[in-house]
């Protein structure tokens, strides 16, 4: 079985309990830096693989401080505080010793509870009746998507 390009993009090598190494992926390269979802995925992957992590992620807030260059990067994870049911994490991505992205996350052991979400599909025509938008930039992760415009002009005030 072949590995999905996203799994390759967030693949990390473990150096120490709190340190991971990865490499940017051309498959998820955006205009000046990697697609934010690939960066967030790699950073969350480091936290999820940490030997002290318990529970599942409840929140993950990522701040991009500067563009990430093509090539290798390091991710450091820090368990800032833990109690019986939750953990608070800090995750930092750096290149050349400079932090370029930082995240805070909360993981928790979920308890069984009642919940109900009511959502309705918006009133739109079938996809095949919508015009295909031309790609803005034919590289990286945008090649994986076909954008269809329901109404208005893309990238213009409607």
Residue spans for each PLM region:
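Terminal targeting signals and extreme-terminal segments of soluble enzymes
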Residues: 1-158
């Amino acid at each position: 079985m072949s590995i999905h390009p996203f799994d390759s993009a967030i693949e990390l090598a473990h150096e120490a309990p709190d340190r991971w190494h990865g490499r940017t992926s051309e498959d998820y390269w955006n205009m000046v830096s990697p697609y934010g979802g690939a960066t967030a995925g790699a950073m969350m992957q480091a936290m999820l693989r940490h030997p002290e992590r318990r529970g599942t992620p409840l929140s993950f807030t990522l701040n991009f401080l500067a563009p990430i260059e093509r090539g290798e990067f390091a991710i450091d994870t820090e368990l800032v505080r833990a109690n019986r049911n939750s953990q608070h994490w800090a995750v930092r991505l750096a290149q050349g010793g400079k932090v370029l992205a930082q995240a805070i996350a909360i993981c928790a052991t979920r308890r069984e509870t009642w919940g109900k979400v009511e959502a309705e599909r918006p009133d739109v025509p079938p996809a095949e009746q919508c015009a295909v938008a031309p790609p803005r930039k034919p590289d990286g992760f945008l090649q994986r998507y076909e954008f269809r415009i329901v109404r208005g002009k893309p990238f213009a005030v409607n």
